[in-house]
Swiss-Prot record:
Protein name according to UniProt: ATP synthase subunit b, chloroplastic
Keyword Mitochondrion found: no
Chain's role: F(1)F(0) ATP synthase produces ATP from ADP in the presence of a proton or sodium gradient. F-type ATPases consist of two structural domains, F(1) containing the extramembraneous catalytic core and F(0) containing the membrane proton channel, linked together by a central stalk and a peripheral stalk. During catalysis, ATP synthesis in the catalytic domain of F(1) is coupled via a rotary mechanism of the central stalk subunits to proton translocation. Component of the F(0) channel, it forms part of the peripheral stalk, linking F(1) to F(0).
Pfam families noted in UniProt: ATP-synt_B (PF00430)
GO MF term set: ATP binding; proton-transporting ATP synthase activity, rotational mechanism
Lineage: superkingdom: Eukaryota
Annotated source species: Antithamnion sp.
Keyword Metal-binding: no
Topology with respect to the bilayer: Single-pass membrane protein
Miscellaneous remark of the record: In plastids the F-type ATPase is also known as CF(1)CF(0).
């Protein structure tokens, strides 16, 4: 750090000596001010056309690039508007499809419910018919059973009441009836 201070001190001492030697020279010919001015004006005159044409070309390129960018921007905006319209149309179509799907689902659900009701009614009708058939069969069986029991009872009563003489009389009367029919 001390070295840095020494360096700054040396520079400041030398600067004060140099500043006495810098000054404005009032002799134009000796200072070459005239030559420098002529050279500067000559360069400006010569380079004006060259640089002007370069700058004009550059300006035309920049203007062309800007107009091309503006044209592309306009095309992009047009495509954006078209895409937004297509998006709106697509959303409308999607909404319509969803509505149609919902209506179709409701119709299918209702038709399934209606078919289920019809099937249940058919099952109820078939059940009632089978119950009626079963009742008829049971009634028929009961009648047959009652008839069989009645015949059995009458038969057992007849066996108990009918003896051999009575059997002979019944057989004889049956034979007589058969002769009369013949």
């Amino acid at each position: 750090m001390e070295n840095n201070f020494q360096v700054f001190r040396l520079i400041s001492e030398n600067f004060s000596e140099v500043s006495h030697s810098i000054g404005l020279n009032s002799d134009f010919l000796e200072a070459n001010v005239l030559n420098i001015m002529l050279l500067l004006f000559g360069l400006i005159y010569v380079l004006k056309q060259f640089l002007g044409s370069l700058l004009t070309i550059r300006q035309e390129k920049v203007i062309f690039a800007i107009s091309e960018c503006e044209e592309r921007l306009q095309q992009a905006n047009n495509r954006l508007l078209e895409s937004e319209k297509q998006l709106e149309q697509t959303q409308l179509v999607i909404t319509q499809v969803l509505n149609d799907a919902e209506i179709t689902a409701q119709k299918v659900r209702q038709s399934i419910l209606d078919k289920g009701k019809i099937d249940v009614e058919k099952l109820i009708g078939a059940s009632k018919a089978s119950i009626v058939v079963a009742e008829n069969q049971i009634n028929q069986q009961i009648k047959q059973k009652i008839t069989a029991l009645a015949i059995q009872k009458v038969s057992s009563q007849l066996k108990a009441q009918v003896d051999t003489t009575m059997q002979a009389k019944i057989i004889d009367s049956s034979i007589i009836k058969l002769r009369g029919d013949i």
